[in-house]
Amino acid sequence: MFILNHAASLMGISVAGTEPTSMLMMDSTAVIHHELFIQQMIQNSRPLFQAFQPCDFTDMLQNICTFHLSGAFYAYLPSPAFLTARESLLRDILSENGISEQDIQQYLTLNAVFRADISHSQSEQTAPQKPFIYLFQLEEMQRRVQGDTFVSWSLSLLHGHDIYVSKKQYAQELRDLADDLSRHSNMRVAFVSETDDIALPTINCWCKQNQWMVQMDRAGFRFSNEMEMIAAASMVLDDCLQKIPPVRKDPQSVQKFLLELAAELER
């Protein structure tokens, strides 16, 4: 239904087994009635996503930690997000960027809460264990090898200014990721290539099947616990995983690539 400034209402009706029908109404009474109907629908609706500010990140993380349903965990990231790096590495990055000790402690607290929920997903005792899947963008990971530093989206959004990551720190994150892959049997890492013709948006996305989804891009953070959205995202990400060639998701091949990339960064 389209309504033009109290003047006209264009309504389309589609019933199974029949041709779609469109009706243009100019009668002011009918148009006002349609406007009231739409306003009522909006008032009774709720947003699919809730945008939140970086200062509300702790509350959001504590909220998602209250969800305890079993389900696969998907993380689609252009490259590893340093928001969830190990504590020692995160402290090193923040210190080298001149962040105050007070702010460092705040970010370490966020990191601990987020990693605790991730750790719960990695170590679920369900039988069989639900998969924990990282999908990274291959070319983006390779591009970050070329410069001396690059900007961490997640940390920069939280701090409000650019936070830079060095080659050495990037290499350490890749080694930590390879280590996690060897320690968790239900963890999988796969690389999406630009040549795969898989339509995925340029966002960071963490999605816990049947529970919640968090998205992050340059505009900020968004949270959803709408089951329809989460189910759709889970299906898209799982379909993406199935389309990736075996060589880019085989655990041994992936671990070898991560360690080789780390070694290249440290030369």
PLM features per residue range, with description:
Residues M1-P246:
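Hydrophobic protein-protein interaction segments
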Residues M235-R267:
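Charge-biased C-terminal accessory regions appended to nucleic-acid-, cytoskeletal NTPase
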